[in-house]
Amino acid sequence: KTNKDLIKEASQMFGKTLITHQTGPQGKKVKKLNSTGFVIKAQIHAGGRGKAGGIKIVKNFAELVKEAKNIFGKTLVTHQTGPSGREVKRLYVEETCDIAEEFYLSCLVDRSSSKIAFISSAEGGVDIEQVAKKNPQKIVTVKINLSKSVSEEDIKKIIQPFSLSNKSKKQAYNLINSIYKVLIEKDASLIEINPLVLNKNEDLLCLDAKINFDDNALYRHPDIVSLKDFNEEDLIETEA
């Protein structure tokens, strides 16, 4: 199970995927994806995988096997791994999709105001911190009292940066309510979807998802603890 799976349980806005611990994904499993193209992602706990060669787009199964062998076991060095890098021990494979637009959406605990903050932007697929520095006017922040649910008016404000049809607006309403529910029920401190894409059929899809959890609340969530990949944990932190 991955971060995407947690959100998928409440919202169906994901393409078909598989995770493999082997150098070459099994043919039968890949064929179930029923796609003419695939995205391979190195599963390491660090950002910047794409620039380090940890994300590849391929057109067919033969290319998929070739690139999987190239990435598996490779040490990726990114701005978040430090100079020693991280060895790739798992691969995540998903279907490609025809992207029309890329958005950014996150939901987090804003400790300064003791509220839940939704952050959205039409500038998806890039580092949101860079967008905040260069184009702060392109970011929308909506804060919600913890004692309340997300109202229709809140959602209208959250999706204001997005160009959505009535069909995709309904999907956005479902997604926003879903990630709010996951954040509260699982004691998460952050849920980030980047990018949230609109495809050519005007469907919203979550292409990448990140969830941070409150370590002090993990005792209430053995299902979350079971997701831990100790190969990706810092040895000193784990011992501590």
Task: Go through the PLM ranges and name each one.
Residues 1-17, 30-192, 197-240:
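ATP-dependent carboxylate/acyl-activation modules
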